[in-house]
Amino acid sequence: MKLLPSVVLKLFLAAVLSALVTGESLERLRRGLAAGTSNPDPPTVSTDQLLPLGGGRDRKVRDLQEADLDLLRVTLSSKPQALATPNKEEHGKRKKKGKGLGKKRDPCLRKYKDFCIHGECKYVKELRAPSCICHPGYHGERCHGLSLPVENRLYTYDHTTILAVVAVVLSSVCLLVIVGLLMFRYHRRGGYDVENEEKVKLGMTNSH
């Protein structure tokens, strides 16, 4: 029964010592975390120097501290990579966005700049092909054909018939004028001949 107070006292002292040691180790670990940005690998602390030898409880505390140190090393080594990967992802997204903006440009400005000869190019997204809006007087896929003006057949027919009628009328008028002149000359010549014959007859009678 006298041994029980001494055993309890020893256990209490061991617990106090372990608490002090763990407090110092945690303080050092916090300092290491504060300096972890400049030096990602924290200095290794030997648990043999921190904890006194002896007892299964001290060994358990030592194992827990080593496990905590390993976890801290893993977190410190993984934090810079975790910080670096989002930057890479953001940079990749920016590049993809830049490529997307380039794809949205009008292909008629660069690729199909000289596609339409006599017209304006217009890219049809549904067909994924360019089309041309031709200037007046041109036709074709690339506005390369010259379209001649088409005359109205009815108009040309009326025009030719009018010209033919005018020509016939003018020719008939000319013929009538010529016939009239010939008839006038013939009648005048016939009257002159009759007068001459009468004069000849009168002269012959006077001579008898």
UniProtKB/Swiss-Prot annotation:
Residues 185-208 are cytoplasmic. Keywords: Cell membrane, Disulfide bond, EGF-like domain, Glycoprotein, Growth factor, Heparin-binding, Membrane, Receptor, Secreted, Signal, Transmembrane, Transmembrane helix. Several N-termini have been identified by direct sequencing. The forms with N-termini 63, 73 and 74 have been tested and found to be biologically active. O-glycosylated with core 1 or possibly core 8 glycans. Thr-47 is a minor glycosylation site compared to Thr-44. Residues 1-19 form the signal peptide. Residues 104-144 form the EGF-like domain. The chain crosses the membrane at residues 161-184. GO terms for biological process: cell chemotaxis; epidermal growth factor receptor signaling pathway; ERBB2-EGFR signaling pathway; ERBB2-ERBB4 signaling pathway; muscle organ development; positive regulation of cell growth; positive regulation of cell migration; positive regulation of cell population proliferation. Disulfide bonds join C108-C121, C116-C132, C134-C143. InterPro entries: EGF-like_dom (IPR000742). Residues 20-160 are extracellular. Residues 36-49 have a biased composition (Polar residues). The record marks E141 as: Plays a critical role in diphtheria toxin binding and toxin sensitivity. Interacts with FBLN1. Interacts with EGFR and ERBB4. Residues 20-62, 149-208 form a propeptide. SUPFAM superfamilies: EGF/Laminin. PROSITE patterns: EGF_1, EGF_2, EGF_3. One of its GO terms (molecular function) is heparin binding. Growth factor that mediates its effects via EGFR, ERBB2 and ERBB4. Required for normal cardiac valve formation and normal heart function. Promotes smooth muscle cell proliferation. May be involved in macrophage-mediated cellular proliferation. It is mitogenic for fibroblasts, but not endothelial cells. It is able to bind EGF receptor/EGFR with higher affinity than EGF itself and is a far more potent mitogen for smooth muscle cells than EGF. Also acts as a diphtheria toxin receptor. Residues 93-102 have a biased composition (Basic residues). Residues 33-56, 82-104 are annotated as: Disordered. It comes from Homo sapiens. GO terms for cellular component: cell surface; clathrin-coated endocytic vesicle membrane; endocytic vesicle membrane; extracellular region; extracellular space; plasma membrane. It comes from the Eukaryota. This is Proheparin-binding EGF-like growth factor. Glycans are attached at T37, S38, T44, T47, T75, T85. The lineage of its organism: Eukaryota, Metazoa, Chordata, Craniata, Vertebrata.
